[in-house]
């Protein structure tokens, strides 16, 4: 079975996986019984994912002073989408309702062909994106590599001496960016001593006990991590959120600015975004670059369109270097991906790879995607010039069957748009 793809799904915060049919629309946090112990629970997340600033420390990601670049609607909209998944007939509308989507936006050639919101969400709602955040971190790092400011072959400790004695010290920048480095990091939520719990305690997703004496910030936590066994860096894919927070630390060290500022200067202020974004931070103000971004669906679609446009925004300005986009679009190490327990025959991500903090399909269209638990997607198809954004509040963090259904729906959407 596929391993968990994000460390933010802590069982203690999840509560019951059974979802109530009643939506969050029109309800207050009090009426929904939300407290620090159930922020990610199956019912409460329909409210919390749309209102994370009420619960977490955050920093702003400034969209800049320029006028937003408005997305226009295509003359021909996406019609009803019907598809088969493992022999079962499904519809796009039925799947979105089943998966508890909050927003679904599709762009073709830079124009909206489908836009839909659920459960009180609107085009102005800043929605929690979980591990989709990783891909923003990765593409900024890839940009610094393209500019010569960051070198993939150089060891992490050359940039961050504070990590010299940790598992990251002798790992290369590229291995950490592609998550093939050796780090002992457990995501066994039934084990209270698992590293995932300490990681999440640093930003408030898990409570610190009165007698807790472990790391209290993201950077403190990263410096405590060690290797596991004798596995060499680069041998196999090992997806852990700690890697992304190291990449963000690299970005801050090279740029000399906080991550939220770099994200604003490099991306958010360059794409004509409709709104600022915000990102969850720890007590020191360090951003949770592995899973803390909150943004509107339309703004995420603009980011996706920049990727399929080889780094250009909607008015043709070069925002990120084409080399960074191509490096991502070319995909990663398929063998390492499969050795890590992903991508084997019959798995939902069969034949995929991981590059620059994106999941790569390795299909003929060179499509790749940003993924976050509970149903967050930014899927980009550079060949067909299609971007698909989904925000959701799914009742479970990971569901391979639902991921498979989503991919079947995406194939049907792209096929229909190709024929229009």
Regions found by a protein language model. Give the residues of each.
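Active-site-proximal alpha-helical segments within enzyme catalytic domains
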Residues: 178-179, 242-250, 289-313, 376-392
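Structured C-terminal helix/loop/strand segments within mature extracytoplasmic catalytic/sensor domains
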Residues: 22-35, 367-420
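Active-site SXXK
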Residues: 110, 128-152, 176, 247-251, ...
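Catalytic-site signature segments of enzymes, centered on catalytic residues
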Residues: 123-124, 188-190, 202-284
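Gram-negative bacterial Sec-dependent N-terminal signal peptides
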Residues: 1-21
């Amino acid at each position: 079975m596929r391993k968990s793809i994000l460390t933010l799904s802590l069982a203690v915060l999840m509560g019951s996986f059974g979802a109530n049919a009643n939506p969050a629309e029109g309800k207050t946090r009090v009426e929904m019984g939300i407290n620090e112990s159930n922020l990610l629970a199956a019912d409460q997340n329909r409210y919390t994912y749309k209102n994370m600033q009420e619960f977490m420390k955050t920093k702003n990601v400034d969209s800049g002073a320029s006028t937003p670049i408005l997305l226009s609607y295509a003359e021909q909209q996406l019609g009803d989408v019907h598809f088969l998944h493992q022999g079962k007939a499904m519809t796009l509308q039925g799947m979105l309702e089943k998966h508890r989507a909050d927003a679904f936006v599709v762009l073709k050639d830079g124009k909206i062909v489908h836009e839909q919101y659920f459960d009180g969400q609107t085009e102005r709602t800043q929605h929690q994106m979980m591990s989709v955040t990783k891909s923003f971190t990765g593409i900024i790092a890839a940009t610094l590599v393209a500019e010569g400011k960051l070198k993939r072959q150089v060891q992490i400790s050359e940039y961050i001496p504070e990590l010299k004695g940790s598992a990251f010290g002798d790992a290369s920048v590229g291995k950490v960016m592609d998550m093939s480095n050796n780090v002992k990091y457990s995501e066994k939520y039934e084990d209270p001593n698992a590293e995932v719990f300490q990681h999440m305690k640093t930003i408030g997703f898990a409570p610190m006990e009165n007698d807790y004496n472990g790391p209290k910030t993201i950077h403190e936590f990263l410096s405590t991590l060690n290797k596991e066994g004798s596995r060499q860096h680069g041998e196999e894919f090992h997806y852990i959120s700690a890697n992304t927070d190291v990449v963000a630390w690299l970005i801050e060290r090279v740029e000399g600015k906080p991550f939220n500022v770099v994200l604003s200067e490099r991306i958010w202020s360059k794409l004509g975004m409709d709104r600022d974004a915000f990102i969850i931070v720890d007590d020191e103000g360090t951003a949770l670059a592995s899973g803390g971004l909150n943004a509107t669906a339309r703004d995420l679609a603009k980011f996706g369109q920049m990727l399929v446009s080889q780094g250009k925004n909607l008015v043709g300005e070069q925002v990120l270097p084409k080399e960074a986009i191509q490096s991502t679009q070319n995909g990663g190490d398929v063998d390492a991906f499969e050795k890590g327990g992903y991508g084997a025959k019959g798995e939902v991500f069969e034949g995929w790879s991981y590059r620059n903090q994106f999941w790569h399909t390795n299909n003929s269209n060179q499509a790749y995607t940003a993924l976050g638990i509970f149903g967050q997607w930014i899927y980009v198809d550079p060949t067909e010039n299609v971007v698909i954004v989904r925000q959701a509040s799914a009742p479970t963090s990971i569901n391979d069957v639902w991921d498979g259904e989503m991919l079947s729906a995406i194939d049907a959407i792209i096929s229909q748009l190709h024929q229009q």
